[in-house]
From Swiss-Prot:
This is Protein FAM222B. GO terms for cellular component: nucleoplasm. Residues 147-167, 183-201 have a biased composition (Low complexity). InterPro entries: FAM222. It comes from the Eukaryota. Residues 147-242, 537-562 are annotated as: Disordered. It holds the Pfam family FAM222A. Belongs to the FAM222 family.
Amino acid sequence: MLACLPGPGDLSLQLLSHTQMNTGLQKWDTTQKMRTAHYPTPAELDAYAKKVANNPLTIKIFPNSVKVPQRKHVRRTVNGLDTSAQRYSPYPTQAATKAGLLAIVKVPAKSILKDFDGTRARFLPEAIMNPPVAPYATVAPSTLAHPQAQALARQQALQHAQTLAHAPPQTLQHPQGIPPPQALSHPQSLQQPQGLGHPQQMAQTQGLVHPQALTHQGLQHPPNPLLHGGRKMPDSDAPPNVTVSTSTIPLSMAATLQHSQPPDLSSIVHQINQFCQTRAGISTTSVCEGQIANPSPISRSLLINASTRVSTHSVPTPMPSCVVNPMEHTHAATAALPAAGPVNLPTGISRAPTGYPSDLKPVTWNQHQLAHLQQMCSEAGGTPAPGLTGKHTAGRELAGPGFVGKAAAYPQELCLAQSFHLKPPLEKPTPSPPVNGLPAPLAYPNGHYFQPLWNNILPTPNSDSSGSQDLTMPFHGGQPTGAPLDCGAAPGAHYRAGTGGGPVASQNSLMQTVDYLSGDFQQACFREQSLAMLSKAHRAPGTRAPDPTDSRSLHIQHPGYR
């Protein structure tokens, strides 16, 4: 054996070099194979995916243990990428943990993939084969910032304004803060001579507006092109500190307000007051109302007082024009609209509230009652006395231009459909004018609906039922209980077909009145103090002293808003 071996000098070198070389190569090769096979780097995976992308279908299963993803794991994947652990990695967690499944599907020419169930999905091969470096893919900018979208919206707004070109003074101008696409509310008029429906009937009502109203608005007010714009602004575009309502500040007045400085509440009230005073002489119905449909977190009481101060001090209440001509009463409405919201004109004589509570079925009036109301409206056209404290010479005569007498309270409420007016609290109550010429309660055609008043004293809002003083606002003298409910119900509640006289009937009438409230103000003072009011409504006749629980004081203490 020794003869077969090489020389002693070369033996150790050859054996050592061979063994070291052999073992070293084997260890290095095994390590290299393990690194490439079991631990592929993301760069290698990316290169492999690009290399195999042209093959129809290539699946490579790494030799390590592969776990089949269960349903709960599949639900946590987005486009095959696990979103549970490594959220921002463009590669699956199986590849990151050196084990898993890699499948590359060849992209068809049309970039449409058919799923197993037959559904199709379109995708972009560039975005799939080249995952983004950033944590998230670059998203297209917001659609609100696209100039093309804004230009398209402006074109639509212009086209929409051109379709309404038959009423040029009503062209909508977008105030600040309102994007053009959301401000396409139809301009409409509140004057609907024949009861054409709610103001929500946009396009139908638009073509039926009284033509004289449009001419009056276009001639007398050239600087105000928005006399009665869309009555409702979208709720989604309004800041949380702006009251969006259907009646407080119309879109027309909002467009004419000054935008150079931040709007102050007093300046807004002043501008609205001027607007109402200029609008008071027009033959159309004014848009200044003492009503807030959707009060916002900004100082509700301030806004209520501000809006009602406008409707209270803008113009003294004129004589109801329905006394002279019942069919033209809509042209002589005062600066305060009924707080019952949108109204219908059933026959041009009376207006009934249109929105009823869901738990109360509206009682429809028959023709007999309407005939009574028309007769009352026609009989109330007596000659008004010169002074406010003039006595009634006849049962149907009026007491003065600013004071509505006992008989005239009903026709004015019938014809003008004026409900209560929210007023700021006065420092001292206004004495009511005495009427001493009424020996007994007069019989009305529908007199069984009303209770007689107190002893020759006509109660007025915020009055102590004593003395006489000038009065600028109408009052409700004929409530169902005889009580001067200043936060009274809608006008239709006074004329419900109902029960006869007596305390029980009065209580029923009051409860019906409470349930019949349909405006945007639900009178909480009724429900809170109903028992006290019922007990005081049927006291013995006599001069009443101001009571802290009276409905007038209640109205001051509890401004009735939802």
